[in-house]
């Protein structure tokens, strides 16, 4: 009888210890940096109680990770093709279908595209 009572007390002690540890120790999240940034208080330009739009959240996450399109890329004077008004597909000479990808009319690898007016 005393052995079963000791087992019950030991079980209760283990359960109580487990619960007290699991409540006080936070489990690290996979996206800890993003969560910290999004939950941070006192962000410049943000008032308390104001919810951010999904685009604003995405912008902030991209800025944090340094994955964004730079202003150098968006300059107006940088054109990908030197021929004004030319399609990007007709811009550079060379092999158009370098690897086995789908063939379409716009890449001019499809058969009988001469009669199609674009």
Swiss-Prot record:
One GO MF term = hormone activity
SS bonds (residue pairs): 81-91, 103-109
Residues excised as propeptide: 23-63
Residues annotated as signal peptide: 1-22
The compartments listed are: Secreted
Keywords, sorted A to Z: Disulfide bond, Hormone, Secreted, Signal
Q: What's a GO biological-process term for it?
A: cell-cell signaling
* Family in the record: Belongs to the plant rapid alkalinization factor (RALF) family.
What does the UniProt function comment say about this protein? Cell signaling peptide that may regulate plant stress, growth, and development. Mediates a rapid alkalinization of extracellular space by mediating a transient increase in the cytoplasmic Ca(2+) concentration leading to a calcium-dependent signaling events through a cell surface receptor and a concomitant activation of some intracellular mitogen-activated protein kinases.
Name of the protein described by the UniProt record = Protein RALF-like 24
- Lineage, top ranks: Eukaryota, Viridiplantae, Streptophyta, Embryophyta, Tracheophyta
């Amino acid at each position: 009888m005393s052995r079963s009572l000791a087992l019950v007390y030991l079980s209760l002690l283990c359960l109580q210890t487990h619960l007290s540890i699991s409540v006080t120790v936070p489990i690290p999240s996979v996206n800890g940096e993003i969560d910290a940034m999004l939950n941070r208080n006192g962000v410049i330009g943000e008032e308390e109680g104001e919810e951010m739009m999904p685009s604003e959240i995405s912008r902030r996450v991209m800025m944090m990770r340094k994955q964004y399109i730079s202003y150098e890329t968006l300059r107006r004077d940088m054109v990908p093709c030197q021929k004004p008004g030319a399609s990007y597909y007709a811009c550079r000479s060379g092999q158009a279908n370098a690897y086995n990808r789908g063939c379409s009319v716009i890449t001019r690898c499809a058969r009988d595209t001469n009669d199609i007016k674009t």
